[in-house]
Amino acid sequence: MDIRPARISDLTGMQNCNLHNLPENYQLKYYLYHAISWPMLSYVATDPKGRVVGYVLAKMEEEPKDGIPHGHITSVSVMRSYRHLGLAKRLMVQSQRAMVEVYGAKYMSLHVRKSNRAAIHLYRDTLQFDVQGIESKYYADGEDAYAMHKDFSTLKFDTPETNDELAKTVQSLALNN
């Protein structure tokens, strides 16, 4: 397994991952806009054959209302057969690191469906995001969203597990299936 910055050639794979997993879908030009505008913020997880199995699509807020430079997670998704391997966490951490190191971001924001317990657990319990409020009827189907925020002032990056360790885990899962 490899985690790396997204390339233009990855965009259709990212879109495919999104279409398989999430109700919020985007046109290819939206992925392209992110890739061109903030090339160091979006990352992909690829399998040994180079196929995109997960991604994080991220951006910097262009005109922040509070005047503070900060990033925003537009979308994150991992294909079902590759979940519970820590890929979403690794993708998010890579994007956070780039927001801080490349753009000087002070915090990151995102929205999550109130019904998405797995994502809320990842953001709140694993990645230490705080719920800032509820945005009523945020999604097209009328569901509310939690507006979440992660302050980078005390950010410390864990050393991610090596690609070799993750590859061994994936290989063992493949052998057991």
From Swiss-Prot:
It catalyses: N-terminal glycyl-[protein] + acetyl-CoA = N-terminal N(alpha)-acetylglycyl-[protein] + CoA + H(+); N-terminal L-alanyl-[protein] + acetyl-CoA = N-terminal N(alpha)-acetyl-L-alanyl-[protein] + CoA + H(+); N-terminal L-seryl-[protein] + acetyl-CoA = N-terminal N(alpha)-acetyl-L-seryl-[protein] + CoA + H(+); N-terminal L-valyl-[protein] + acetyl-CoA = N-terminal N(alpha)-acetyl-L-valyl-[protein] + CoA + H(+). Keywords: Acyltransferase, Cytoplasm, Nucleus, Transferase. Catalytic component of the NatA N-terminal acetyltransferase, which catalyzes acetylation of proteins beginning with Met-Ser, Met-Gly and Met-Ala. N-acetylation plays a role in normal eukaryotic translation and processing, protect against proteolytic degradation and protein turnover. Its main location: cytoplasm. It is found in: Cytoplasm; Nucleus. Its EC number is 2.3.1.255. Gene3D superfamilies: 3.40.630.30. It is an enzyme of class 2 (transferase). InterPro entries: Acyl_CoA_acyltransferase, Ard1-like, GNAT_dom. GO terms for molecular function: protein N-terminal-serine acetyltransferase activity; protein-N-terminal-alanine acetyltransferase activity; protein-N-terminal-glutamate acetyltransferase activity. The keyword Iron does not apply. One of its GO terms (biological process) is protein maturation. Belongs to the acetyltransferase family. ARD1 subfamily. It comes from Schizosaccharomyces pombe (strain 972 / ATCC 24843) (Fission yeast). This is N-terminal acetyltransferase A complex catalytic subunit ard1. Component of the N-terminal acetyltransferase A (NatA) complex, which is composed of at least ard1 and nat1. Pfam families: Acetyltransf_1. GO terms for cellular component: cytosol; NatA complex; nucleus. Residues 1-153 form the N-acetyltransferase domain. The keyword Nucleus applies.
